[in-house]
């Protein structure tokens, strides 16, 4: 009996997908809403020792008691208010101005449900380090950065190779900046509770700050000792605030520039440590540094080559962003600094840089610089554009495609015959529930997390394609709503079916067999066949006839697929980010190649 139990444990262990640290989306295929496919390993070449940093804002907590205001909505009602600071349409009470609504809502940076989403999305993108914006005074947003560190460490324990962290302090060696660096050193770095997250450069934790603020102090041995301790702990790269002049000292790093960007921190071999890539810039040709609502501001649709695009759809294509990436490829630095991920908010001033009723850093969809997906508008286009360019910059070790010869599976609940089948990993621990306050009166509740998908397998023979899926715990009843759906793209085209998926399994609640349905176009499905399936504990296996998928039994084929459980909104691909579990996340798919 003991030997039998040991054998069963070994068999189960062989089939259980291990949770190893990896950026599992780095090499998966995806196609964005514009039909742009992510490049493959063959297209981008071998992996290189390059790094990607992303500007990240942790200040979405301290002022979150304020109500949300979206200025473009007010201006749509009263266009004359655009340049009138005192127009009565503008609220006199305290509000916070958002240029649009994030996909995850008007969240606070302490919302661990959102932080976990960020961890997975940025790991899948191949981002190496997040730079926290602490450029204003001595603010470090402790509550937020500690929530992020805790969540990222939890994600790492679940197998997510999250980005590491660094801070960018003020653009000059101010007393407030010294206060900030002492605070984060004592609270975060010296205790080293989250040392695994510290991004190092030249062997030390990196900080974008000016070391001069930590100079020795004549006559004050105690402060001198503190300054030396902190000064010796970090590698310093001071931030250059100006967009058009490049580095003004050998150790300068940039954060945002207009095209053509400069290389920063020249190296002995003639290369550069760093260069910037921005989504847009609060700059105009006639005024230089400008508010984002100044006419002529360099928005998302602007390029130095062609000026301001008049195409209404250009804002969705990231023209400015792509031009900046092309320049970064020319510079070929060690690290690209991207601005940015999730700023979202901006102040409003009577006059700033000659602009009345000025919104300095953001304004509307066109005049904003966030990559994080938004509700409506350009959706997640900029996220996948970033992923594509990170792949081109860093290269790829290999394409995550599984190739296999014929391998017959018996659908009998005995999973031993899956040993040796093509295996795919999925991140565990991402079905946590959400119950968090947002900005103002917003409160977000999401209890859709249910079956936590942790792995998948595929096999085929002349008659069937076999799918296996594994969850972290026992799979719930097939009678549950939106239960364990399998999406299949049989032609690898995004223009056919629904969002490229030609077939869906389990859209209709299964009975003795599962129902396979086909889409000719959009979220309109018709029955294509039945599929035998078996669930046992945390595992399920399915056999789908090749004829039902219109896949010739003699020809090799490639398919993309994904598993999704408990989606809440049919026909909305953005629900893959928001509800239940999707493996892999968002628009990413697994790729299977039959020999």
Task: List each language-model region with its residue ranges.
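Bacterial Sec-dependent N-terminal signal peptides
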Residues: 1-22
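Glycan-processing catalytic domains of CAZymes
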Residues: 22-410, 414-415, 422, 500, ...
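Residue-level detector of buried hydrophobic side-chain packing
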Residues: 54, 122, 343, 467, ...
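Acidic, glycine-anchored loop motifs typical of Ca2+
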Residues: 221, 408-438, 492-496
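Acidic/polar low-complexity flexible segments
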Residues: 401-412, 419, 487-514, 547-595
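Short, well-ordered beta-strand segments enriched in hydrophobic/aromatic residues
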Residues: 413, 464-473, 539-546
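Beta-strand-rich interaction surfaces with strong enrichment in secreted/lumenal proteins
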Residues: 454-457, 528-533
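Short coil-to-beta strand junction motifs in C2/discoidin
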Residues: 478-485
